[in-house]
């Protein structure tokens, strides 16, 4: 397990029609905690956030590549691979990426995806632009697999 610094609790809850309650963060570093016992959607926004899952289905959703960059990524806590999901479909759509290439080495070309697992922390890295930092998310205490990630959402 990684050592986790304490961040202030933040975000604003909304209740979209026909969707689970959604907690949206700001561009500040903050801790967003899902509702216990019911489905929740957590959207961190900018800054290196901590998104905390609770009992019940949680969706950790990303809309822009700047929501979690490789030089200061978000950390997901209490991720349950049997019912939770990381949704990066908005990041890919925002960057006009229509195909991905999952590989073992670092991402080189736009659309390349790398999943690593070291010392109890998994990291998802996606090359979203030719230059600049990659989109990146750390998942504490879970061996992250491609089936835990929604790359292309069908709406």
Question: Language-model segments: what does each one mean?
Answer:
Residues 102-106:
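An exposed tryptophan-centered "aromatic clamp" motif
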């Amino acid at each position: 397990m990684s050592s986790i610094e304490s961040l202030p609790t933040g975000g604003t809850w909304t209740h979209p029609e026909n969707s689970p309650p959604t907690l949206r963060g700001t561009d500040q570093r903050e801790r967003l905690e899902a509702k216990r016992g019911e489905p929740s959607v957590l959207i961190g926004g900018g800054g290196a956030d901590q998104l905390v899952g609770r009992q019940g289905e949680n969706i950790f959703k990303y809309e822009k590549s700047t929501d979690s960059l490789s030089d200061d990524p978000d950390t997901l806590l209490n991720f349950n691979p049997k019912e939770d999901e990381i949704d990066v479909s908005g990041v890919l759509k925002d960057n006009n990426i229509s195909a991905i290439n999952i590989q073992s080495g670092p991402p080189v070309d736009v659309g390349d995806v790398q999943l690593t697992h070291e010392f109890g922390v998994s990291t998802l890295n996606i090359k979203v632009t030719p230059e600049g930092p990659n989109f990146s998310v750390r998942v504490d205490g879970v061996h992250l697999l491609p089936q835990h990630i929604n790359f292309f959402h069908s709406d």
